[in-house]
């Protein structure tokens, strides 16, 4: 249920920085990273690209990493990822030093479970909420049930059950799930017709404006 410190990564200390050095590291299958926190000087590292991506894929960005830095163990969390806009590969990672027993603030995904009542439409307004938890006890996800929920049901962040030792940071009134009455076929047809009329009116207005400018 909770993250563990079993995500071992053997990392190397970067001896050179800059764009050129980062490109060379990525070509070698490494991910440039900076480790910071607890008042220490930022440390420039190279993470094993394949292993780090596997940790994120299987355990998520809230996974506690156990970094082996020149034989010394250091726990860390991923705080930010810089992703290539086209290739969608990790270009750089920002890591935060954490200690056993220390509490950290993180975002955790909210998963909706169950089947709402008949003739309802369910929308998830928020996909994640902020919580505070011990670094080694961050829940992988939080669940909220909509089983049998009727139209008008609204579930907020403050109504989500949290594990022991975990506290809510997000606004308790933050809307997470909204259940409304499903529109009828006639209502849907009316919405489509209204949208088409609005689009036609916008096109006509644009054509009239263009004609006026050309005169």
Curated annotation (Swiss-Prot):
Picking any one GO biological process from the record gives: translation
Keywords carried by this UniProt record: Ribonucleoprotein, Ribosomal protein, RNA-binding, rRNA-binding
Q: What is this protein called?
A: Large ribosomal subunit protein bL25
Q: Which InterPro entries match?
A: Rbsml_bL25/Gln-tRNA_synth_N, Ribosomal_bL25/Gln-tRNA_synth, Ribosomal_bL25_b-dom, Ribosomal_bL25_C, Ribosomal_bL25_long, Ribosomal_L25_dom, Ribosomal_uL5_bac-type
Record's HAMAP family? Ribosomal_bL25_CTC
Bias class Polar residues marks the residues at 1-10
Q: Where does this protein come from, organism-wise?
A: Mycobacterium tuberculosis (strain ATCC 25618 / H37Rv)
In the record, what terms sit under GO molecular function? 5S rRNA binding; structural constituent of ribosome
